[in-house]
Regions:
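Conserved DEDDh/DEDDy metal-dependent 3′-5′ exonuclease domain
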Residues: 2-101
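Cytochrome P450 catalytic domain signature, combining two hallmark sequence patches
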Residues: 47-53, 103-108, 197-208
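Extended active-site and interfacial segments that coordinate phosphate-rich ligands
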Residues: 183-218
Length: 429
């Protein structure tokens, strides 16, 4: 369509909408540029332009906003929501913060959170989790708090030192390693919240049945189901079912990307559920709940490491909710099952085999070559796929030339399964 004649453009668009009557309009930059331009043109040329299917309502306009998330500043452009049909702008999607926008993910978010699809496609997963909590509270007859901020209870310096801590991180053993298994806890923090009944109204409360937070000794009542724990339970159960279904399909199967989009949406909701417990704008959380989750997470990882050592495994690195283990002659999934079963028995949490590496390289810290970088490694799975974390190609501020060059080098290394032959490939790179 030609933009030079605005009146003709508007008439052509009206005819297209009347002829095809679409249920969904997909755009790129539709919120921030296209629809504002069309509405301004319609006003300037006095053309009755209504992209909505509902003749009585043209559109709903939401102002642009700026917000911070995990140290990065994001701009959300103004939004144009239609009536009677959806408008989805894949360039104005908060879903794009963690993974590429997917309509299937937006629909899954809307289905789980009971938020309309146009809003779910644009809002952060944190807003979706808040909607889930509000819905759960209303079903249980719980009043919605008017004030978001909850005052933190006083702690002495010793109490604060014992309670205030994040996830546990063991530095990796620098170098090239062979036949390593990566074990990941399934949605560790959300699973802890569900298993331990952690919610704003249960942490710090005593009852007939109590569990105590490691280190701090804060009580968690088990007498009643916590709101957050009850909201998370169906979410985690569904994500676990989806992940197990994905294993039945190969990556090139048409069903695989569909299930991946659903799993991604559920993953983000579970991911933000933990951080929201200590967030000032959370209606139902408090900082004690956040501290309890971190403490239990640290204890869980220590238990997993101790279990691995007892069963004769070498732990190369452990990072918050995962650990990389190695054992002589252990290079098949069944070789690691006894370890996983024992960890699940001791912790009460599901742990999964992410994969077995033919070879894996942990890089050294830039400041001290004797110390491993906290989260920078790359390796080749036994099924041929390459896993890369913390390298230049993963950074958003890396230029394409550097990222592509690094990608080609690593792909060349991934062509070799025997780690002893890797040095010979360096000269070719």
């Amino acid at each position: 369509l030609d933009l030079s004649d605005e009146r003709e453009l508007l008439e052509n668009l009206k005819n297209i909408l009347d002829e095809y009557d679409p249920d969904v309009i997909f755009t790129r930059w539709g919120d921030g540029w296209l629809f504002p331009f069309l509405f301004e043109s319609a006003k300037r040329h006095q053309v009755d332009f209504n992209p909505s299917r509902d003749a009585q309502q043209k559109y709903r306009h939401i102002q642009e906003s700026t917000f911070e998330s995990y140290g990065s500043i994001y701009f959300r452009a103004q939004q144009t929501h239609l009536f009677g049909r959806w408008h989805i702008d894949n360039k104005n999607s908060t879903m794009d913060m963690g993974f590429k926008f997917s309509m299937r993910s937006a629909i899954e978010l809307a289905r789980v959170t009971s938020v309309d699809v146009q809003t779910a496609a644009r809002n952060s997963p944190g807003s979706g989790f808040t909607a889930m909590q509000i819905q759960g509270a209303l079903k249980r007859g719980i009043l919605i708090p008017l004030q978001k901020r909850q005052t933190e209870q006083f702690k002495s310096a010793l109490e604060l030192n014992a309670a205030d801590g994040g996830g546990l991180n063991y530095r990796p053993i620098v170098g090239l390693h062979q036949d390593i298994a990566e074990l990941d806890f399934f949605s560790m923090y959300p699973s802890i919240m569900m298993t331990w009944n952690i919610s704003g109204e249960t942490v710090g409360v005593r009852g007939k049945k109590i569990r105590y937070v490691p280190d701090s000794g804060v009580p968690i009542t088990q007498d009643v189901d916590g709101l957050v724990a009850s909201v998370l339970k169906p979410l985690l159960e569904k994500r676990l079912r989806v992940k197990r279904m994905m294993k039945k399909f190969t990556p090139d199967d048409p069903q695989h990307p569909i299930l991946q989009s659903v799993a991604d949406a559920l993953k983000w909701l579970g991911y933000v559920s933990f951080g929201y417990q200590g967030y000032k704008n959370n209606l139902f959380g408090n900082i004690q709940a956040h501290e309890a989750i971190c403490a239990i997470g640290r204890e869980t990882l220590v238990t997993a490491i101790e279990t691995a050592h007892e069963l004769g495994f070498r732990v190369l690195v452990a990072n918050v909710d995962s650990l990389f283990v190695q054992k002589e002659a252990a290079n098949r999934p069944q070789d690691f099952k006894p370890l996983m079963d024992e960890i699940m028995f001791r912790t009460g949490l599901i742990i999964e085999l992410e994969g077995i590496f033919d070879w894996l390289i942990f890089t050294a810290s830039k400041l001290n070559p004797r110390i491993g970088a906290a989260n920078r490694y790359f390796g080749k799975f036994d099924h041929g796929e390459l896993k890369v974390r913390g390298m230049a190609q993963r950074r958003s501020d890396t230029c394409n030339w550097i990222a592509n060059a690094e990608r080609e080098i690593l792909n060349l290394l991934a062509s070799e399964s025997n780690p002893a032959h890797l040095p010979a490939l360096i000269s070719q790179a």
